[in-house]
């Protein structure tokens, strides 16, 4: 599943990635997760491009020899993740990978993400279903082809804030509790009335 399959003449120093580039790259149906190189009918290398991109592991990018065969099969599952993650996009997942692995691919949560749970939208027969996955189940929740994951943001409100506006010297937000327990304390914190 490459853009332009076929036989190619490459330099003696060419690697698996050079050959994939020459063939136009992997097409929309091809896998990035398990690319095999066969030599004399036996598998001599297997590469997961995600392992290379995310971890820098270049072990499977071997130098090719005459008559090597590169096999790029179809992907197992494509899922999308959006909302409050650092790299929201579509990712290819292997059969045994879970929501936790997807979040790692997506760079994990942003600073303003609601991390207690996430929503998974899944095709169920003729309609969609929504699954709320709690944080302690991330490592065991399996993903399937076509799943969409959404991470919400925290609620845009404060648990300990009061705001003063108007005829005070320093209007703005102030922490409640501690030194500010009454309206008079708040006016004092704002340096008094004008």
Q: What is each of the regions a protein language model found here?
A:
Residues 1-194:
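Ser/Thr/Pro/Gly-biased, low-complexity, turn-/loop-rich segments
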């Amino acid at each position: 599943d490459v853009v332009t399959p076929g036989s190619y003449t490459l330099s003696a120093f060419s690697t698996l990635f050079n050959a994939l580039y020459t063939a136009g790259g992997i097409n929309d149906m091809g896998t990035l997760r398990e690319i095999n190189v066969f030599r004399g009918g036996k598998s001599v290398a297997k590469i997961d491009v995600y392992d290379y991109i995310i971890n820098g592991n270049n072990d499977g990018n071997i130098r090719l020899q005459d008559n090597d065969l590169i096999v790029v099969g179809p992907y197992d599952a494509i899922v999308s993740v959006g909302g409050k993650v650092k790299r929201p996009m579509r990712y290819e997942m292997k059969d045994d990978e879970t929501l936790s692995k997807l979040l790692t691919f997506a760079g994990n949560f942003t600073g303003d993400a609601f991390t207690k749970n996430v929503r998974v939208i899944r095709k169920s027969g003729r309609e969609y279903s929504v699954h709320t996955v709690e944080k302690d189940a991330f490592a065991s929740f399996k993903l399937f082809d076509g799943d969409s994951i959404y991470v919400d943001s925290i609620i845009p409100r404060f648990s300990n804030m009061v705001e003063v506006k108007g005829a005070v010297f320093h209007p703005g937000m102030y922490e409640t509790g501690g030194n500010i327990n009454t309206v008079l304390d708040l006016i004092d914190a704002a340096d008094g009335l004008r």
